[in-house]
Amino acid sequence: MKWYAITLSPSNPTLSSDELDGICAELMDRGALGTTVERAPEITCYIQGDEDALKGFLAQLGDLPCSLQATNEVSESNWTGSCPEVWEPIHAGNLVVVPVESSEDTRPVPEGALRIIPGLGFGTGHHATTRMVLCELSAFAANPPDKHPSVFDLGTGSGILAIAAARLFQVPVEAIDIEEGAIMNAKDNIALNHVEHLVSASTTPMQDIKGSFSLILANLYGEVLVQLADHVTRVATPGATAIVSGITELVWDQVHEAYCEKRGWRLVRENADSGWVCAVFER
């Protein structure tokens, strides 16, 4: 998985700071993981993905009052330094997430807050997809059908969802991701939050997962959720809850069909934010 920096030039070079902020917010809503304005009015945004993801992101920018100036692949280890919004605390339900630069970061944080180092497994809760899962997870924890759920985090990224679940329920959590770099980032965050005894993170392929889980968390692209629907159903216990996100409104119907119409899941609730959908399914 690659990181790309995309530089845009607004059509109106005299935009106010509020107008520039509006364009930056729109880019985040459309999937950018960070934005910066180093040489106003030029805006640089950052995305993660392969070349198809890059093409898809660029294709949806046609209605913005900007022209494309440059697209560059950037180092995954350096880009976060260019994005000040990465470091803002996030409140999601009863959870607070505080991004930090490293385990040596000694800034005070609210009691009980999750500390997350941004990295290849980007996931600090800033993006709507992650934030909605955290909110749903917080709500689930307030009135769980099982106070000690067996938890599986599919596509763990930075480990934020697995860490949150471990903190909320004090139960073991199995987390996987296909990216070795993401798992390294997740393990750093797991240690940072002192839940190494609860969370295991690995690159184990989904088809090799043998356990059964009553709570499944999956913040993935909607198309991937469709592809993995059989495996998600296979590892779910009867009555299991799945909180899924990363779904664009364009593919939501496909995800609903794959889980509810074809595999017997029941839609409990769906939420939308900035063009993204998060859903809670029960088996």
Predicted regions, residues:
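N-terminal auxiliary segments of SAM/dcSAM-dependent transferases
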Residues: K2-R107
